[in-house]
């Protein structure tokens, strides 16, 4: 389905929701915490990782403040943000304020998403410039590179797979075979290139479909893999894949049966 078809179907869905007095309009700010527990003999001790994705920040509103409060309560050892920090130049300043607060007193790592590159076409910073700003505000950006975070655990970040900027070969070249390998990628479109090569892949991009109707499911998933990896937990040739539904939105400010998400990954 192309964007025009999606918007037409979305309009019809919103009309039906409005006519029924549906609560779905409130889902934009109704954040859900999802938990994943993984065990591996490669880990030496425990580690709590919290994943944020697809912030698409336009301002510091109720949803962003709620996310910061949730993050504080979860108290992760490591925070990871899997791309799409902004989609409009006006979102840059509030996004950097959000990121600075989110990263205070904790390790934080990130990768770029498609909109982090595309925003340059709207008069915003380039992807490289944005990555530099994020580093200055507390996020260590892993652009096709790896970084050990704990004894036996290594993070591997790749640039955006949706726009084919990822260099999986270069990123994997930097790690050994014995570590527990966690890859950060904006889109699950990278799965065919990494399945069996990493232990855990954390991605976003899909927004979980954003608008999901009963029986029909997600109306539109912006991925070359279609609806194969929409949201939640999957396994691909020994690789655990987790796709986060994101905090923000695309096209229109609405979510239906698809609440925004913060993911907690407890490694034991």
Positions of the model-derived regions?
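N-terminal secretory signal peptides and thylakoid transit peptides that target proteins
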Residues: 1-14
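Extended active-site neighborhood of metal-dependent phosphoesterases/phosphodiesterases
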Residues: 37, 97-160, 164-167, 173-175
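Beta-strand-turn-beta hairpins that frame and shape the catalytic cleft
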Residues: 40-50, 139, 147-155, 235-240
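Membrane-embedded segments
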Residues: 52-130, 137
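Active-site neighborhood of phospho(di)ester-bond hydrolases with catalytic His/Asp-centered motifs
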Residues: 52-53, 79-83, 108-114, 142-143, ...
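Short beta-strand/loop segments at the ligand-binding rim of alpha/beta enzyme cores
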Residues: 175-183
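Conserved beta-sheet core of the metallophosphoesterase superfamily
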Residues: 188-263
